[in-house]
């Protein structure tokens, strides 16, 4: 309760570094959670431009990705999700910025956990022995906790007043709809696509 959460893990190499053609970086997903009443801010993002789940959706639909999302078996940029799933070589988010962020997350996780780097995980027969970091900051232990909560609320309200690009689709913060999703899942079960 009332804690900031920062969690991440490294993975097997599955992305080329910016400027490279073969996988040397991990997808290294990170989750950030900031308390906000019953609806916390939740950011859950991997370092690849498209999650592997989203690539599966595009593959099944037969639609091309909106932008090049990774490399095919000929080491060429592609919008074909099936080709990226075959090579496991997605582009990093933000191109060179995501490449750097992936590297930093890997090295920090390995250092703090005393574990393997992405390179070392990739040398194993299975994706095991990952380095993971779990940081929890109890806001109740801070002297200015009321001001922190007020700042979070004011920032989120300000963000939501941004003029939407698409009329009828208001701007919302990450995690805003999770309470609705959870409630629906509790009532109707978790949807599973066959």
Predicted regions, residues:
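Conserved thiamine diphosphate
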Residues: 1, 5-22
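Generic secondary-structure signature for well-ordered alpha-helical cores
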Residues: 3-4, 37, 48, 76, ...
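Short beta-strand segments
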Residues: 6-9, 33-35, 43-46, 136, ...
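Phosphate/diphosphate-binding glycine-rich loops and adjacent basic-rich segments that engage nucleotide
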Residues: 15-82
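General structural feature for long, well-ordered alpha-helical segments within catalytic domains
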Residues: 28, 89, 100, 108, ...
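Secondary-shell segments that build the walls of catalytic and ion/ligand-binding clefts
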Residues: 60-120
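Catalytic-core signal marking the mid-to-C-terminal active-site face
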Residues: 117-194
